[in-house]
Amino acid sequence: MAIINRSKLTQTTMIKQILKRCSSLGKKQSSEYNDTHEHDGDSLPLDVPKGHFVVYVGGNRVRYVLPISFLTRPEFQLLLQQAEEEFGFDHNMGLTIPCEEVAFKSLITSMLQPTYI
């Protein structure tokens, strides 16, 4: 049991560090937006499967397609709060996460790992 708790503590610490690095990106992100993906009118891009959504991450605005289940995860909700504070949600840039891509990849990888209790 102690090993599991220690593992959870380590994962929690890692997630906190990742979120801290994400928030440090700040206003370094570009405010330009070029959406080069195919769209069907005002709907989602055609390459986004049902049950997924798109976010843009980092200074180069790398596009990620994520499962909607991430929206309920507290660590992802913190990123959304940072995005709202940084950019608001009323802009033409798509959902942009103010986070370095390396830190974001690390967070997503940890979120995809099964949780053992």
Curated annotation (Swiss-Prot):
This protein's UniProt keywords? Cell membrane, Developmental protein, Growth regulation, Membrane
Q: Where in the cell is it found?
A: Cell membrane
Tissue specificity annotation: Expressed in trichomes. Hardly observed in leaves.
Please cite one Gene Ontology biological process associated with this protein. Answer: response to auxin
The entry's cellular-component GO terms read: plasma membrane
The protein's matches in InterPro entries, at most eight in alphabetical order, are given as: SAUR_fam (IPR003676)
Induction, per UniProt: Repressed by abscisic acid.
Topology in the lipid bilayer: Peripheral membrane protein
Which top-level group of life is the source organism from? Eukaryota
Q: Pfam families recorded for this chain? A: Auxin_inducible
Q: Give the protein's function.
A: Provide a mechanistic link between auxin and plasma membrane H(+)-ATPases (PM H(+)-ATPases, e.g. AHA1 and AHA2), and triggers PM H(+)-ATPases activity by promoting phosphorylation of their C-terminal autoinhibitory domain as a result of PP2C-D subfamily of type 2C phosphatases inhibition, thus leading to the acidification of the apoplast and the facilitation of solutes and water uptake to drive cell expansion. Triggers plant growth probably by promoting cell elongation. Regulates branch angles and bending.
Homology family: Belongs to the ARG7 family.
Q: What name does this protein carry?
A: Protein SMALL AUXIN UP-REGULATED RNA 54
Organism of derivation: Arabidopsis thaliana
